[in-house]
């Protein structure tokens, strides 16, 4: 379930106890000038949340997941660790793929990236324009060469 920008206590309560993963789209809220989804309230209520780009030409013309993670941390009050988890494992769960993707776990497909040195995981979210990704791996294999700085 996505586009939850206007969710309140009643909607959050309805999601609680279900198998539905609320998928939050901060890029769409940013582009359309809407209020951001209440991620902190959902997390406080015990819900898992996923993050997605909603990449499309009408309401979210960017598939930049670094920006999505940054907006979740900066505008939706998620910690950087929560935002990264929401964009990876919870995103895979929302698509019914968490048994094969979303975390670095034996038996799962190894899709991941390596970063340049950072002082902390928080730096990844808050320095969203700094070129931090060094190498990308899909199915355990490096894609191309090192990412230019």
Residue ranges of each PLM-predicted region?
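Structural signature of the urease/amidohydrolase superfamily beta/alpha-barrel
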Residues: 50-53, 92-93, 98-124
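Active-site-adjacent C-terminal substructures of enzyme catalytic domains
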Residues: 1-100, 128, 142, 148
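C-terminal cap of metal-dependent C-N hydrolases
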Residues: 87-89, 109-149
């Amino acid at each position: 379930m996505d586009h939850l920008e206007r969710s309140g206590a009643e909607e959050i309560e309805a999601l609680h106890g279900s198998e539905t993963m609320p998928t939050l789209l901060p890029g769409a809220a940013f582009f359309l000038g809407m209020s951001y989804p209440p991620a902190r309230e959902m997390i406080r209520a015990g819900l898992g949340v996923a993050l997605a780009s909603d990449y499309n030409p009408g309401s979210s013309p960017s598939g930049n997941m670094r920006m999505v993670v940054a907006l979740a941390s900066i505008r939706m009050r998620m910690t950087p660790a929560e935002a990264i988890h929401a964009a990876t494992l919870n995103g895979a769960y929302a698509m019914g793929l968490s048994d094969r993707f979303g975390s670095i776990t034996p038996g799962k497909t190894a899709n991941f990236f390596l970063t340049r040195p950072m002082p902390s995981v928080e730096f990844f979210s808050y320095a969203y324009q700094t070129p931090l990704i060094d190498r990308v791996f899909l199915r355990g294999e490096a894609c191309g060469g090192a990412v230019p700085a």
